[in-house]
Swiss-Prot record:
Belongs to the DNA gyrase inhibitor YacG family. The keyword Membrane does not apply. InterPro entries: DNA_gyrase_inhibitor_YacG, Znf_NHR/GATA. GO terms for molecular function: DNA topoisomerase type II (double strand cut, ATP-hydrolyzing) inhibitor activity; zinc ion binding. It comes from Legionella pneumophila subsp. pneumophila (strain Philadelphia 1 / ATCC 33152 / DSM 7513). This is DNA gyrase inhibitor YacG.
């Protein structure tokens, strides 16, 4: 019995098998994976929601004190 799940590539809709050895899953190929990355980078893909006012973003100082150096 074959229990491997068939999925469609989110970019080209090509059917492929969800397998641990598919390094590009859920995409069918490196090409489709890079197309998706490019769409996120160019902001043609976004998570819907309200815009955030940059002035309201709280920043933190992540520097750690180096106690051992004296």
């Amino acid at each position: 019995m074959n229990n491997q799940q068939k999925i469609k590539c989110p970019i080209c809709d090509k059917q492929n098998t969800w397998r641990p050895d598919n390094l590009f899953r859920p995409f069918c190929s490196e090409r489709c994976k890079l197309i998706d990355l490019g769409e996120w980078a160019s902001e043609s893909r976004k998570i819907p929601g309200s815009s955030i006012d940059p002035e309201s973003i709280v920043t933190t100082n992540n520097k750690q004190d180096n106690v051992d150096e004296q």
